[in-house]
Amino acid sequence: MARVKRGVTAHAKHKKVYKLAKGYRGRRKNTIRTAKAAVDKAGQYAFRDRKRKKRTFRALWIQRLNAAVRPFGMTYSVFINGLSKSGIVVDRKVLSDLAINEPAAFQAIAEKAKAALAA
């Protein structure tokens, strides 16, 4: 069997890790052992935060809706209850966007929700 020299393969693998570690501070960008650990940890954070992002944005939309319905004399939970009773099926992301960009349309929805609660 012929001898296999691994220099080219090792260099390619290291290059791949260094490319991912570009922009890191200190030895984390140019020492293979620390760069590999840093890149692995970054991947763990990225995986975790892709899940967390969904929760964070939903919480943001809820906070925006709570602030938007307060002038109409309602809280967020009362508003959502009114929406379900009135049969309006719009998700929180769209409602939040309406509250910011289309206040008149959001006001109409809020009034319908309030009317459904009164009935």
Swiss-Prot record:
GO terms for biological process: ribosomal large subunit assembly; translation. Keywords: Ribonucleoprotein, Ribosomal protein, RNA-binding, rRNA-binding. The keyword Ribosomal protein applies. NCBIfam families: rplT_bact (TIGR01032). It comes from Rhodopseudomonas palustris (strain TIE-1). Gene3D superfamilies: 6.10.160.10, Ribosomal protein L20 (1.10.1900.20). It holds the Pfam family Ribosomal_L20. One of its GO terms (molecular function) is rRNA binding. HAMAP family: Ribosomal_bL20. Binds directly to 23S ribosomal RNA and is necessary for the in vitro assembly process of the 50S ribosomal subunit. It is not involved in the protein synthesizing functions of that subunit. This is Large ribosomal subunit protein bL20. GO terms for cellular component: ribonucleoprotein complex; ribosome. The lineage of its organism: Bacteria, Pseudomonadati, Pseudomonadota, Alphaproteobacteria, Hyphomicrobiales.
